[in-house]
């Protein structure tokens, strides 16, 4: 009877160890996934900060002014020629 008890006891310890080993494995896996997600969030925040720098409204004002100037530029010589005509 005694060897059976020892074998059952060792089997119980082995099952307990196996369960905790799986739990530890799962915990390590979750920690690694969490760290990866945190790193991705930080990189995403950095990219968002860069987007704010690119979307500077002052730069857009200059671009808009150049676009308007390109549309009006061909008409400037006509305005210059017609300006003295109206002063007579």
Curated annotation (Swiss-Prot):
Positions of modified residues (Valine amide): 85
Keywords from the UniProt entry: Amidation, Antibiotic, Antimicrobial, Immunity, Innate immunity, Membrane, Secreted, Signal, Target cell membrane, Target membrane
Subcellular location: Secreted; Target cell membrane
Signal peptide: 1-18
Expression by tissue: Expressed in entodermal epithelium along the body column.
GO cellular component terms listed in the entry, alphabetical order: extracellular region
Main subcellular localisation: secreted
Residue stretch(es) of the prosequence: 19-59
Presence of keyword Membrane: yes
Family: Belongs to the arminin family.
Biological role: Antimicrobial peptide with a broad-spectrum antimicrobial activity. Keeps its antibacterial activity under a wide range of salt concentrations that mimic physiological conditions of human blood, which is surprising, since Hydra is an obligate freshwater animal with nearly no salt tolerance. Does not affect red blood cells.
Protein known as: Arminin 17593
